[in-house]
UniProtKB/Swiss-Prot annotation:
It comes from Homo sapiens (Human). Residues 207-424 are annotated as: Disordered. It is linked to Acrofacial dysostosis 1, Nager type: A form of acrofacial dysostosis, a group of disorders which are characterized by malformation of the craniofacial skeleton and the limbs. The major facial features of AFD1 include downslanted palpebral fissures, midface retrusion, and micrognathia, the latter of which often requires the placement of a tracheostomy in early childhood. Limb defects typically involve the anterior (radial) elements of the upper limbs and manifest as small or absent thumbs, triphalangeal thumbs, radial hyoplasia or aplasia, and radioulnar synostosis. Gene3D superfamilies: 3.30.70.330. GO terms for molecular function: RNA binding; splicing factor binding. Component of the 17S U2 SnRNP complex of the spliceosome, a large ribonucleoprotein complex that removes introns from transcribed pre-mRNAs. The 17S U2 SnRNP complex (1) directly participates in early spliceosome assembly and (2) mediates recognition of the intron branch site during pre-mRNA splicing by promoting the selection of the pre-mRNA branch-site adenosine, the nucleophile for the first step of splicing. This is Splicing factor 3B subunit 4. Residues 13-91, 100-179 form the RRM domain. It is found in: Nucleus. One of its GO terms (biological process) is RNA splicing, via transesterification reactions.
């Protein structure tokens, strides 16, 4: 356990332990810091006259990461009722002091060094244990303390966040401490900040920087909608941040139909237009062999570019037109009825067209009436029909039932054997 020469030690993997009680020994110090990592050796300088240690020691670990971890978990724990101080024991530790020292006033007497360290270490690296000024006779706190940060960013954040906040039911005051041997000059001046920015040791070798000064995680890139490895949106989709294309008005060419094809015909009476004129191609009357250009290719399949609104104008099957002529007049012939069913012929002159056959599904449109004629009236109950009888109101008492009528008994057959007809 005895330490070798200082020149042979790994100063970066060695920690300083202060505030030790007189009962602490080197074996106890070894077992305590073994919880943080593999310990190479321990050393507690002793007085040559009394042979007692002087209240501090050194613990060398196998690696620098173990020393940083020991500083993180062992600093300010209580050993025999006294909080111990654990920090780096490197030879240039004093060069890390950039002057970011703050003063904390109006402290409650119950506040100790560990509470201050746990509270203010959230703002940055603390070089030394917080120093609470105490009465040398009684050991009671005088109500103020000092903390030395490793950077001005940490001290600025601590002053901004903690000044005026309540700690143990007392509002504390946090500000930069006065410099020693100076006339009212405080730390945190522009000259100190400039020297701290030019000091490479303050940025490269801070105590336990593995935990407090870890680099921030890289920000995730914004997701870009891509199609087949490019930054363009998929085909048919508008680019991000733009509005969808407007719906074309009735009669305009849809996007999927080439200009060479004739536009689909308009339904009768749509948009206030009347029937086509005599000079319009395909506007012949039924029975003259002229019909509208068929909007579907053979087989009843719609064109690939037609919209749902145009499909609805041509009927659910896409096999006819409202103005198509009767069978045999140039239009599409109707389907043959099943065997045993009458052939649905055209209605007589002046009669409304027939409705859908009985048993057809709801919503299935029947044949369109001729232009200018009204369809069949909606199904209404007969005049004077009031619906099914209503049940009697609650609490209604029925009258006495009439006595049952006596039913006549059947005649009793005669007793004895039946005789045949008497002889003449």
């Amino acid at each position: 356990m005895a330490a070798g020469p200082i020149s042979e030690r790994n100063q970066d993997a060695t920690v300083y332990v202060g505030g030790l009680d007189e009962k602490v020994s080197e074996p106890l110090l070894w077992e305590l810091f073994l919880q943080a990592g593999p310990v190479v050796n321990t050393h507690m300088p002793k007085d040559r006259v009394t042979g007692q240690h002087q209240g501090y020691g050194f613990v060398e670990f196998l690696s620098e990461e173990d020393a940083d971890y020991a500083i993180k978990i062992m600093n300010m724990i209580k050993l025999y009722g006294k909080p111990i101080r654990v920090n780096k024991a490197s030879a240039h530790n004093k060069n890390l002091d950039v002057g970011a020292n703050i003063f904390i006033g109006n402290l409650d007497p119950e506040i100790d060094e560990k509470l201050l360290y746990d509270t203010f270490s959230a703002f940055g690296v603390i070089l030394q244990t917080p120093k609470i000024m105490r009465d040398p006779d009684t050991g009671n706190s005088k109500g103020y303390a000092f903390i030395n940060f490793a950077s001005f960013d940490a001290s600025d954040a601590a002053i901004e966040a903690m000044n005026g906040q309540y700690l143990c039911n007392r509002p504390i005051t946090v500000s930069y401490a006065f410099k020693k041997d100076s006339k009212g000059e405080r730390h945190g001046s522009a000259a100190e900040r400039l020297l701290a920015a030019q000091n490479p040791l303050s940025q490269a070798d801070r105590p336990h920087q593995l935990f407090a000064d870890a680099p921030p995680p890289p920000s995730a890139p914004n997701p870009v909608v891509s199609s087949l490895g490019s930054g363009l949106p998929p085909p048919g989709m508008p680019p991000p941040g733009s509005f969808p294309p407007p719906v074309p008005p009735p009669g305009a060419l849809p996007p999927g139909i080439p200009p060479a094809m004739p536009p689909p015909p308009m339904p009768p009476g749509a948009a206030g237009h009347g029937p086509p004129s005599a000079g319009t191609p395909g506007a012949g009357h039924p029975g003259h062999g002229h019909s509208h250009p068929h909007p579907f290719p053979p087989g009843g399949m719609p064109h690939p570019g037609m919209s749902q609104m145009q499909l609805a104008h041509h009927g659910p099957h896409g096999l006819g037109h409202p103005h198509a002529g009767p069978p045999g007049s140039g239009g599409q012939p109707p389907p043959r009825p099943p065997p045993g069913m009458p052939h649905p012929g055209p209605p007589p002159m002046g009669m409304p067209p027939r409705g859908p056959p009985f048993g057809s599904p709801m919503g299935h449109p029947g044949p369109m009436p001729p232009h200018g004629m009204r369809g069949p009236p909606p199904l209404m109950p007969p005049h004077g029909y009031t619906g099914p009888p209503r049940p009697p109101p609650y609490g209604y008492q029925r009258g006495p039932l009439p006595p049952p009528r006596p039913t006549p008994r059947p005649p009793v057959p005669p007793r004895g054997p039946l005789r045949g007809p008497l002889p003449q």
